[in-house]
Amino acid sequence: MLNKAIVPAAAVLVFLAASCNSGRKEPLVEKLSLEDTTKYVTFKMDVELPAPVDASSTAIREGIISSLDDQLTRITTYEDERMFPFYEGDHNDTDALLGYYKDQAFSLLSKEAEEDAQERIGYLMADDELSEEDFARMIEETPKWEYEYSFEKIGETPSYVVYFSRNYIYMGGAHGGITGAGALTFDKSDGHLVEHIIDPSSTVPMQSLLVKGLLGYYSENGVEMNEEELLGSLFIEDGIIPLPGWEPYPEGDSLVFTYQQYEIASYAEGMPSFQLPVNDLLPYLTSEAKAILGL
């Protein structure tokens, strides 16, 4: 039987006040935290959704659900295949919606973690050179899988709202890894996802800015280097730094750029992240980005 530790079954509704001057209140936000565990896996899920109070918030909610579905239905595969179906129930019922994805994802992880553990135990049982003491110790040390999924709001203005999707997964290897969809910026005028903040064709003309940002990241982490040393250390082709797979997102008067693990650097170097002033990026912003930024 599964040991369950589910943090409140009902979603928490929270009012977020926008501006004290305007007296306007932002739409209701629904937050749900779920957790489940077995002997070989722990699953945690924290999701924040806008309540569907109007057309814009409903569209944003559906965009988040689509992204959540895309990630959780593929958590144990690198192929472009679904491991369980899209939720066809009422998308306005947050408990049922997220409960479905938690149950499906946890069931999938539980099955594969159990299979992995039994395979490891089988190898140990076949090793005639192991003492009983070592065998018992290694059985006790069988790795426990972990999966932590979060989708939370990280920024909002009257024109746009930014949500961030991030998940940590450990499947018994040397270390875990961080993946996810990254930042999703929605236009609040109608709730559509702004797919590109930076024009994807801007990679080459933006090289000096990307170099500047990365040199700043390494300097802040105690590593001083020049441009030549930087380019020689990165996992890039032809000396060209790519735009990050995660879309940059607005924060104040800047855009935040974050590279994922192994995207351009080693695991030990973390996830290079830096901010660049919007004013320096004007030639490279998409028309949609300029619209939500009021440019």
Task: Describe every region a protein language model picked out.
Residues 1-28:
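Bacterial Sec-dependent N-terminal signal peptides
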Residues 20-295:
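Compositionally biased intrinsically disordered regions enriched in Thr/Gly
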